């Protein structure tokens, strides 16, 4: 364990449940790496993701973005391909891109968008894109004919959230350089989206635990009952 991490750990009481402002403030103060660390939110939910009716998945545009330059690949043809290029997509194509991904194991992009008519083609590389979280999905707004809107939202700071096998959602909410106030705005937007996405089949306490941490720093726990205060 590094010296900086040990020093940072002393600032955070591991047994405490902070309010969101306190936790984010501590996370910013304990991010001591020599680069602009990403601040991440980790929420354990009271769901059983093995059941189809307890999946939590969606997307939300963070008001202050993520601080990350996002590279967007779009599968589209004709007018929709032109629309994607004009909207600022980094890569646009169809079967040619499928072949490139298959033959070169090519992943120089962060988000994949596809028009619905292209999903048959994209499906050929589902086994490759799926495990990397890159498969376009209607729930996250990445399967759409409105490619210009999808690209604009992604570039503006749209993040996808999805509960993993251990019932936890991991999501970036910005960079250390944002400061506490902007991080709090992003945190609140994402938490509100998670609360709205609560499955009807989920019983008992929904927000089990909430932690924020920087890339290299320790985590600060937030009181789940006061997450949106």
Swiss-Prot record:
GO CC, any one term: large ribosomal subunit
Gene Ontology MF annotations: rRNA binding; structural constituent of ribosome; tRNA binding
Keywords: Repressor, Ribonucleoprotein, Ribosomal protein, RNA-binding, rRNA-binding, Translation regulation, tRNA-binding
InterPro entries found in the cross-reference section: Ribosom_uL1_bac-type, Ribosomal_uL1, Ribosomal_uL1-like, Ribosomal_uL1/biogenesis, Ribosomal_uL1_3-a/b-sand, Ribosomal_uL1_CS
Pfam families for the chain: Ribosomal_L1
GO biological processes: regulation of translation; translation
PROSITE patterns: RIBOSOMAL_L1 (PS01199)
Similarity comment: family membership: Belongs to the universal ribosomal protein uL1 family.
NCBIfam families: rplA_bact
Assembly with partners or alone: Part of the 50S ribosomal subunit.
Function text: Binds directly to 23S rRNA. The L1 stalk is quite mobile in the ribosome, and is involved in E site tRNA release. Protein L1 is also a translational repressor protein, it controls the translation of the L11 operon by binding to its mRNA.
Record protein name field: Large ribosomal subunit protein uL1
Source species of the chain: Clostridium botulinum (strain Eklund 17B / Type B)
């Amino acid at each position: 364990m590094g010296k900086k991490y040990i020093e940072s750990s002393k600032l955070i009481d591991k047994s405490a449940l902070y309010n969101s402002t306190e936790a984010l403030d501590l996370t910013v103060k304990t991010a001591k790496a020599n680069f602009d660390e990403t601040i991440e939110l980790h929420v354990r939910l009271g769901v059983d993701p093995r059941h189809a009716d307890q999946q939590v998945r969606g997307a939300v545009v963070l008001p202050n973005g993520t601080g990350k330059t996002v590279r967007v690949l779009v599968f589209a043809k004709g007018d929709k391909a032109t629309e994607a290029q004009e909207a600022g997509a980094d890569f646009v194509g169809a079967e040619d891109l499928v072949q490139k991904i298959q033959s070169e194991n090519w992943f120089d992009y962060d988000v994949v968008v596809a028009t619905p008519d292209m999903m048959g083609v994209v499906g050929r590389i589902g086994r490759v894109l799926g495990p990397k979280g890159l498969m376009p999905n209607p729930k996250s707004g990445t399967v759409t004919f409105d490619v210009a809107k999808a690209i604009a939202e992604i570039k503006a700071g749209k993040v996808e959230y999805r509960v993993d096998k251990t019932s936890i959602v991991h999501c970036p909410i910005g960079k250390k350089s944002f400061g506490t106030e902007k991080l709090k705005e992003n945190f609140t937007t994402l938490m509100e989206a998670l609360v709205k996405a609560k499955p009807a089949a989920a019983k008992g306490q929904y927000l089990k635990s909430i932690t924020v941490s920087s890339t290299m720093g320790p985590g600060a726990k937030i009181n789940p009952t006061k997450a949106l205060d």
